Structures are given as structure tokens and as C-alpha cells.
Amino acid sequence: MPENSYPDRSHLPASPGVYIFRDGEGRVLYVGKARNIRSRVASYFTRSGDGRPKIAELRERVRQIDFIAARGETEALVLEANLIKRHRPRFNASLRDDKSYPYIVVTTGDEYPRVFATRGPHDPRHRYFGPFPSAGSVHATLDVLNKTFRFRKCRGPEPGRRSGIPCLNYHIGRSAAPCIGAVSKEEYGAIIADVIAFLEGRVDGLIREREEQMRRAAAEMDFERAARLRDEAAALRHVRDRQQATIASEDSFDAVGAYAEGEEACVQIFAVREGRIVGRDSFLLDNYGEQDAESVALSFVPQYYETAAVPREVLVSSPDEEALAPIAEHLSRLRGTRVEVRRPQRGDKRRVLELALHNARMGLEHERAMSEARRSRLSSTLDRLREELALPRLPMRIECYDISNTMGTNSVASMVVFQGGRPAKDQYRRFRIKTVEGADDPASMAEVVRRRLERLLAGDEKFSPAPDLILLDGGKGQLSAVAEVLEGLGSGGRLPDIPVRALAKREEEVFEPGRPGPVVLAPDSAELRLLQRVRDEAHRFANAYHRKLRGRAMTASVLDDLPGVGPVRKRRILEHFGTPQAFLEASLEELEAVPGLPGRVAREIHARLHR
């Protein structure tokens, strides 16, 4: 792009804030922060500016520059983190599949808090711990927590049943049962405080408390309580002893190590509490803008600690004190007390940081090696699939369609996309069937594929590019109907040659238009496994959407015309359970726990749900 065609920058202020680069369609390409917005943006467009190829590409694509003024660097830092999380700009380093990372939530906004795993939006009234790298690590942590602290597991802001009978969890030692007064509100609050202390890594203090309480209980001849406290201390000690002691002092801090290479980056966070490594989390980031490792870390830290527990000290490898100061100020506000963000020069803390840096590099190298091996295997599989199915080209983009309904009602369809043999979930689409009455799968399939291809012909970016293979969950009927659609829309060369095949469930046979018999792939072949995986994903996605619509309809039908349930009470019931599916699966005890719902009405709802 010649210099005179660069976007106008005359409106940019020489003050702190964030700048936003957009393309010709208004999409956010990059978000950055600066003490002087005008000067920082100008540096992108000077001949002596950043010469990285990706920055050159960014310059070529930017058509509009917006800004948001801030009252200082800390406010600019927060704005930048929020905008990156909201827009996920291509040229910013950002967590892969950010929505998929699980958290542990302690519902501190409730009178009797719950503790459970979540992937949903965060409620500012509650405390969140994470993100955790996997669901397995969350559930393992929750299991240890529940065995040790016996917090309640029943749903809703209020514990227990209206019947006053404690649940099974109480009888197996997994609930303190505040619902029946087995513990007071204050005692249950102490349980939750211990859960939070555990999640913050203050395990040694919890052990000391239990040992002291155990000795006191034994002295008072309360041997049953002393035995329970002994077991709790032993469980906590077991958790602690699995953690490697790394430093002589009892300091608590996080060490953030980052490694970046090309368009990928890895960040590893080593959590040290009371002198022990109590956790190590690894995150892979897309780094399309090819930022260096220090920039990746400084961008990642504010985003990560918006939801993660903030320690007293965060160690990073950047020596840029001016960049670290607003981060420290922001984290201090989040924690409520002073937080130090610095680069250690020597000693144990330096060694832990170097360990995090080394592991970040190893993590990225391992991921790349694994990705390369997967790509090689998938490439071979796709090539063999092309030969077996007589496709005109390598099926790099496979789209699969499935229909789901219940006796012709709430009829929906799914479109899932596999790119290079792997699911591209951001390109999944779902449809409500509009023109077909009843359970007519071939006609429904034809409608959906026609709508999808008409969007492609209209230039809709949400439905481009064209697939290399359309796969149908069905048999000859669906195949014939869709082949007719392709023939009609493809007349006059409007569509590229798009092959279509159908995978029948019963015999796992592949059908091709114009071929009387099926293509039979080897039962244990990678090619058939790939087609099955694509088909099963389309089936799952269609069923999930159908259940959602059916759940809404069933919820309305169960609650409509029910004596004692008006609009306000109906809204409270649905808010209590969160989703129609959770309501439809509710037990009588869970219905009785809905605030303000009489026991008689709860029993009537339960009877309607299970008749």
C-alpha cells in the first residue's frame, strides 16, 4: 500500500489509551495500548518502523483506525485486555479455544455457597479459580475438595429439600448438610473459607489449623471429631506432599514463562505457594502478529488474572519497568492489596522463572511435533479417501449435514465442518427447517443444502468457501435429493464441482450418485474412521440443537396452565435451573429447593415431568 493511501491518523490524540486497527469490512484486526496513541500508531507506518512480515501484512489490510482515550496507562491496559477478549483480533496473541477452558466457581454471592466446575459466563458476585488446562484437572480438584471439606452439592442458592430429609451426600460423608442444621451458617461459612484458602494454595495453614483442632477435640474427649480432623489433615498433607518443594523460603508467587515462534506461542504459569510448586498450567496461543515472547507474556498476564486468583507477586522475564508498572497497579486493584510484578535477577525465584521459560519452550516444541505428526497422518488419510471415493480433489474441507426431529416436530439440521481432517467449530452452522412438513428427511436435507449453497452464491462470507466434499448422514433417499439440488444450482457453471456422498449408519456404507452399489471402506481403516467421526459430530450437533428447542417447548408446556405458577414464578423457576434441560431433568428435591415454590406445586411439576 503506498504511503498516501494509509488510513487517516490526524484524529488520533497524543494521550494514553488504546488504538484499534480495522479492515475494510470494519472487522478488528489488532488492538494495542499506548501512552501516546498518535506516536505509537505512527510508528507502524514509517519506513524505519517494524519490518516483520506480519506487520507489513497488517499495514496492507488496515483501512480504519479508532481509539479509546484512557485516563492513564493502567486504564488503557484494562481496556486493551477487554477488547482483545471480546474481539479476538487476528494479529493479537490470544488463547486458543478460550471458551473451552474450565473454572472452579465458589458462589460467594449465595448465603450457602456452592463449589462446582463451569465454562459459562462469570457472575461478578462469585469467586472464580482458573482457568484450568483440562476438565480432568478440575474434576480431580473438586473431588479432593469435596472429600475434605464436605460442601453442599445440591443446586440452587438455598440448600436441601423442603421435606427436611438430608440427601445421600450427607450419609456418605460428602455434605455437611446445612439444610438440616447439621452445621450452622457460620460453620458452613468457615468450610467455604477453607475451600477458598485451598484454591489459593494456602494448604500448610489449613493443615496446621486441623492439627490444632484435632488436639483440642481429643483433649475434650470428642474422639469422633478428632478422627475426622485427623483424616482431613492427612488428605491435605497428601496433596501437599505430591508438590515439589522448590525454594527454601515460604514465599508465594506465580512465575510466567512465555515462548513464541512464528504464529504460535506457549505460556506456562508455575504457581508457588508457601515455598512449593502447587500447580503448573500451560496455554497455547495463536500469535498471528508474531509478537516476541516478552510481548506475549505482558499481553497475556492482564487477561489471565481477570479470572484467576492474583498472588502477591508475579514474576516475568521482561525488564521493561515502564510496561510492568501499569500491570502491577491493575493486579493490585484486582487483589485488593499491593501486587509486585517484576523480573527476578538471581536466587530461587530466578530459577523458578527459568523453569517456566524452559517449559514454555518445551511445551510449544512438543505441540508442534504432535501437530506435525497429526497433519502427516491426516494428509495421508485424506489422500486415500480421495482415491477410495473417486473425488476430484483432496477433501480438505468436508461439510456434513444431519437432520433431527421428534415425529416431525422441532425439525432442525446441522452443518459441521472439518478442515484438514479436524473440526472447525467456528464454522459450524445450524438451521431450523422452514419449508418441510413432518418427518421428511430427504426433503429437509435438500432444503438445508440449498439454503447453504444459495448463501455461498450470494457471497455470504459466513458460508464460504465451497466444500470439497458434502457428506450426508443418511442413505440413498437423502443422497438423491441433495444431488438434484446440486445439479440445479450448478447449472451454467455457477457452482464449482462439489461431490456429495452419503454414509449410511447400519452397514457404514458410502453411497455415490449414479452408482448402484455402495463403496465399502475397510472397517478398521483411518478413512472410514474419519467419515464416522465427521458424521457423528453432525449427529451430535443436530441433536443438541433439537434438544434445546424441544426443551424450551416442553418447559413451556409443563408450566403453562399449572395452578400456582404465574409469569413471575415461571421466570424464577427457569432462572434457578439456568437451562431448559436442567429443569426437565430436575428431581423432586431440586424442585423443592426453588426459592418461593410451595411443596405442593413442586410435586405437581415433578409429576408432569415424569408422567
UniProtKB/Swiss-Prot annotation:
UVR domain sequence ranges: 204-239
Compartments where found: Cytoplasm
Major site of localization recorded for this protein: cytoplasm
Pfam families given in the database record: GIY-YIG (PF01541), HHH_5 (PF14520), UVR (PF02151), UvrC_RNaseH (PF22920), UvrC_RNaseH_dom (PF08459)
GO molecular function, one term: DNA binding
Cited SMART domains: GIYc (SM00465)
GO cellular component term of the entry, any: excinuclease repair complex
Keywords recorded for this protein, A-Z: Cytoplasm, DNA damage, DNA excision, DNA repair, Excision nuclease, SOS response
Biological-process GO terms, alphabetical: nucleotide-excision repair; SOS response
Recorded superkingdom: Bacteria
Domain GIY-YIG, chain residue ranges per copy: 14-93
Database matches in PROSITE patterns: GIY_YIG (PS50164), UVR (PS50151), UVRC (PS50165)
PANTHER family: UVRABC SYSTEM PROTEIN C (PTHR30562:SF1), UVRC/OXIDOREDUCTASE (PTHR30562)
Its biological purpose: The UvrABC repair system catalyzes the recognition and processing of DNA lesions. UvrC both incises the 5' and 3' sides of the lesion. The N-terminal half is responsible for the 3' incision and the C-terminal half is responsible for the 5' incision.
Family: Belongs to the UvrC family.
Subunit annotation: Interacts with UvrB in an incision complex.
Protein name as catalogued: UvrABC system protein C
Organism, scientific name: Rubrobacter xylanophilus (strain DSM 9941 / JCM 11954 / NBRC 16129 / PRD-1)
Gene name in the database record: uvrC
